Amino acid sequence: MIGKNLSNPIPEWAEHGADREVVPYTVATDMDAPNPDSGEEWFHTNTQLFNVLDAQNRFKGAEEVTEPWNAPPTNATPTMDGFVSDYISTFTAEIGRQPTYEEYAHIMTGYTPEQLPVLSAIARDFGVFDRWFSEVPSQTFMNRSFWTAATSSGIVVNSPVSKRLTKNDAETIFERLEQHGKTWKVYVMEPMSLSFHGIIHYPRLKDRLATNFVAFAEFERDAAAGTLPDFSLIEPTSSPATATTTRHSGAHSAVPST
C-alpha cells in the first residue's frame, strides 16, 4: 500500500467531510480499527469492490438489504473504490447516526511492517498468498465449508446457524480420508467447546463429533506420543471472550482461522 497514493471517494450523501471528496490511504494508529466492524456479507462486498449501493439498501442492516443486492453490471471490472461508501452506510445502520470523517476514514488505514513484526516476519520468511480468491465473497462459515467440502451448499451468509444443521450436506474431505483408510481429527483449542467445522458440516459429521473432534490438549499428547492421525486440523481459539491465538481476532473477521 505504501507509496501507491490510494484513495476512495466520499459519497455526496455523507453528512460529514463530503467536501474533502476523497479519503486517502494512511497508516493506522489504532489496533481496533475500524470499529464497528466493516460489512462482511456478499452484498457489502459488491459495494466495496464496485461502489454500487442501491438507494433502498443505504443505511440498512444485513437483514434488511433487498434485491438486487448492490449487484454491479454484468462483466463489470472491480474498481475497489466503494469501501468508504459501504462503511458509512454500515456504521449508520449499526450506530444510528452517520460517522464523522475521522470515524469513517479508519476504513482506509493499514499497518506497517514495524507495527506488525510477527506477521511481517511470517510474510517475509514463508509463503504468502498475494492473489487470494474467496469462493464466496462473504462471511466466514461459507469459506470454511469450501475449505473442507469444496462447496457451501448454496449458503451465502452465516445466519441463521440453523441452516448448518440441516442444509449443508455435501461430502467432506474427512469422509474422503476415511474412504481411503486414513485417520483424522479436528483439535479445538480451549476454551472453545464446539468445533466450527463440526457445526458447519453437522449433517454429515454429527456421528463423529464425540470421536474425531477433540480438545487441543489431546493434540499435545498425540504429538508427544507420535500418534497423530494422518490428517490433523487445528481450530485456534477465536472466541471474543478470550485472548485469541489467530489473526481471526475473535468474532470480528470474514476469513477462516488457519
PLM regions: where:
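N-terminal pro-sequences and low-complexity stem/linker regions of secreted or lumenal proteins
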Residues: 1-258
